[in-house]
Swiss-Prot record:
Keywords: Adaptive immunity, ATP-binding, Cell membrane, Cytoplasm, Immunity, Inflammatory response, Innate immunity, Membrane, Nucleotide-binding. It comes from the Eukaryota. GO terms for molecular function: ATP binding; ATP hydrolysis activity; GTPase activity. The gene is NLRP10. Residues 597-609 have a biased composition (Polar residues). It is a peripheral membrane protein. Belongs to the NLRP family. GO terms for cellular component: cytoplasm; cytoplasmic side of plasma membrane; cytosol; nuclear membrane; nucleoplasm. It is found in: Cytoplasm; Cell membrane. CDD domains: Pyrin_ASC-like. The lineage of its organism: Eukaryota, Metazoa, Chordata, Craniata, Vertebrata. This is NACHT, LRR and PYD domains-containing protein 10. Oligomerizes. Interacts with PYCARD. Also interacts with CASP1 and IL1B. Interacts with NOD1 and components of the NOD1 signaling pathway including RIPK2, NR2C2/TAK1 and IKBKG/NEMO. One of its GO terms (biological process) is positive regulation of defense response to bacterium. Residues 1-96 form the Pyrin domain.
């Protein structure tokens, strides 16, 4: 039997040893005596090796180290002897076997199982968009051409031109649209053989915010991290880079919009490692999928050569209903919660965003379990977050002196969030939580934890359940971290920095922190804040917030501000009444996803501006309905705009 026919590592090992000439076999045993064979294992003694024939040596190595490690041991010796042809043949067997080892590793990832990624999954809507040709075009990323829905299976397809198959895909979407869940689901589906069968030998998931934990800024270390194995056969994995797919999840968490304004001016070595991949300087023939929020596109675009752009739009109406059924284990609770949401246009529309849908479900479940009647009517995503936070903050005791008193915990969460964003940090050690007087395990509604292997040690790190919670508490920090009599010098400086960076970055949408703070600064939000979080906003502080609101609204209306919708035909009249849009055309495209054939999916990109002061126009988006042109447009002066929601990672549901 030739080695190429070997089906198992033990068979390949035996044939590799048997192929050695007598003198080479003696040399291999000599090198094995002095070699550090496996972590924690002593070298083989001369007496153990003396007189052994190939089959005996194979049995000895397998009994001491197991099949896979035994192959690695022999490979080390053969490399020292420079028997590269035999190394190549044996490596191929090792690689083929390691694919299955890695697939099993992915299938068993505990944190993904807990997040429900491998269980009930709700589909999200994806549409293809062209790559942006210039930074200015980012404000109007849907040029005048047909936008088509795209499936995950077809992300790297070229249609009828195989030579033009994209090797780099940018998946962009607002916070909470389901990018992380989709990215992880792709890796799991590949591992189970249902996605890209035969196309990729390895699909690696890289969380951009976790790259900081790499021990070294080397590609080898990144692969060890992805495989969860410091002995992974890196050389063999990289032998055919065109059969590798790296999913870089959360580019916006690697490089935040305010990065250059803070203490961090240059790229860290670990960021540079990912930049080399993105620029195609490292492994230029591998495939890449990069997920990001729109804000980071201005930083990402200069790194790209040719990329396919895909936009994630969140849930369809059917998926919204399915999500409630999967989230609530009690059918009556699910029906009651969905009924509440359906009767509230703001909640129903917000639940198109999977992350906000999770927040709404968690909030409603918390209210029901406490026996409370839901009387609130949230007006925007900020109100939804306030309702969630006020529900899950620990209650004040009668004396107001509890270590977990409501206001103390709120202030601590705010200070942790602000410190993290100001220093470009999204992972926190337990010592950092203690510094802010936070007890991580008792605040699972806001903080999640994971254990990471750092060298020989295992360390626990915390993060906010989603970056949107960190943004929310960052916005709240301007109200609670000082003496509360005024916004405070430090807070005023930070707010001014927000405004300055916003002005310098031109047409970018506002950050989520700014959106939260703008909503909070509205006068009718003050009483809601005071009631929910047990602190009073002084007249001076209210005046400071009013000034910020005026500045922010002025800046917003002096620029083209992108607003993305996924609409259904029945919602058009409400949309036109709710906001005025400039140079907008609607693309109507029949969707088989709808329950009724009379309803059709709308994908809209609009440009909001301040009439005559508008500096940039977005071209119309044209489409067809069953072969006939059906274009509706309006050219009225823009007057309002709303930010977008957030993404969340639950304990055992979709997000």
């Amino acid at each position: 039997m030739a080695m190429a026919k070997a089906r198992k590592p033990r068979e390949a090992l035996l044939w590799a040893l048997s192929d050695l000439e007598e003198n080479d076999f003696k040399k291999l045993k000599f090198y094995l005596r002095d070699m550090t064979l496996s972590e924690g294992q002593p070298p083989l003694a001369r007496g153990e090796l003396e007189g052994l024939i190939p089959v005996d040596l194979a049995e000895l190595l397998i009994s001491k180290y197991g099949e896979k490690e035994a192959v690695k041991v022999v490979l080390k010796g053969l490399k020292v002897m420079n028997l590269l042809e035999l190394v190549d043949q044996l490596s191929h067997i090792c690689l083929h076997d390691y694919r299955e080892v890695y697939r099993e590793h992915v299938r068993c990832l505990e944190e993904w199982q807990e997040a429900g990624v491998n269980g009930r999954y709700n589909q999200v809507l994806l549409v293809a968009k062209p790559s942006s040709e210039s930074p200015e075009s980012l404000a109007c990323p849907f040029p005048e051409q047909e936008l088509e829905s795209v499936t995950v299976e077809a992300l790297f397809d070229s249609g009828e031109k195989p030579s033009l198959a994209p090797s780099l895909v940018v998946l962009q979407g607002s916070a909470g649209t389901g990018k992380t869940t989709l990215a992880r689901k792709m890796v799991l589906d590949w591992a189970t053989g249902t996605l890209y069968p035969g196309r990729f030998d390895y699909v690696f998931y890289v969380s951009c915010k976790e790259v900081v934990l790499l021990l070294e800024s080397k590609l080898e270390q990144l692969l060890f991290w992805c495989c969860g194995d410091n002995q992974a056969p890196v050389t063999e994995i990289l032998r055919q880079p065109e059969r590798l797919l790296f999913i870089l999840d959360g580019f916006d968490e690697l490089q935040r919009p305010f990065e250059e304004k803070l203490k961090k001016r240059g790229l860290s070595p670990k960021e540079s490692l990912l930049h080399l991949l993105i620029r195609r300087h490292t492994l230029p023939t591998c495939s890449l999928l990069i997920t990001t929020r729109p804000l980071a596109l201005r930083n990402l675009e200069p790194l790209l050569k040719q990329a396919r752009h895909v936009h994630i739009l969140g849930f369809s109406e059917e998926e919204r209903a399915r999500y409630f059924s999967s989230y609530f284990t009690d059918e009556k609770q699910a029906d009651r919660a969905f009924d509440i949401v359906q009767k509230n246009d703001i909640l129903y529309k917000a639940c198109q965003v999977p992350g906000i849908c999770w927040v709404v479900c968690s909030w409603l479940q918390g209210q029901m379990e406490r026996g409370k009647v839901v009387l609130e009517t949230p007006r925007n995503s900020t109100d939804i977050f306030m309702a969630y936070v006020s529900t899950f903050l620990p209650p004040d005791d009668d004396g107001g002196c509890s270590e977990l008193s409501r206001h103390r915990v709120l202030r601590s969460l705010c200070s942790l969030a602000a410190e993290g964003i100001q220093h470009q940090r999204f992972l926190f050690e337990e010592a950092e939580l203690r510094k802010h007087n936070l007890d991580g395990p008792r605040l699972a509604a806001f903080l999640s934890s994971n254990d990471y292997q750092l060298g020989l040690a295992i360390k626990k790190f915390y993060s906010f359940r989603h970056i949107s919670f960190q943004d929310f508490f960052h916005a709240m920090s301007y109200l609670v971290k000082e003496d509360q009599s005024r916004l405070g010098k430090e807070s005023r400086r930070e707010v001014q920095r927000l405004l300055e960076v916003k002005e310098q970055e031109g047409n970018d949408e506002m950050t989520l922190t700014m959106q939260f703070l703008l909503d909070i600064s509205k006068k009718d939000s003050f009483s809601n804040l005071e009631l929910k979080f047990c602190f009073r906003i002084s007249p001076c502080l209210a005046q400071d917030l009013k000034h910020f609101k005026e500045q922010m609204e002025s800046m917003k209306h002096n620029r083209t501000w992108d607003l993305e919708f996924s609409l259904y035909e029945a919602k058009i009249k409400n949309l036109v009444k709710g906001i005025q849009m400039n140079n907008v055309s609607f693309k109507i495209k029949h969707s088989n996803e709808k329950k009724s054939q009379s309803q059709n999916l709308f994908s809209v990109k609009s440009s909001l501006s301040h009439g005559p002061k508008e500096e940039q126009k977005c071209p119309s988006v044209h489409g067809q309905k069953e072969g006939k042109d059906n274009i509706a447009g309006t050219q009225k002066e823009a007057s309002t705009g709303k930010g977008r929601g957030t993404e969340e990672t639950p304990k055992n549901t979709y997000i």
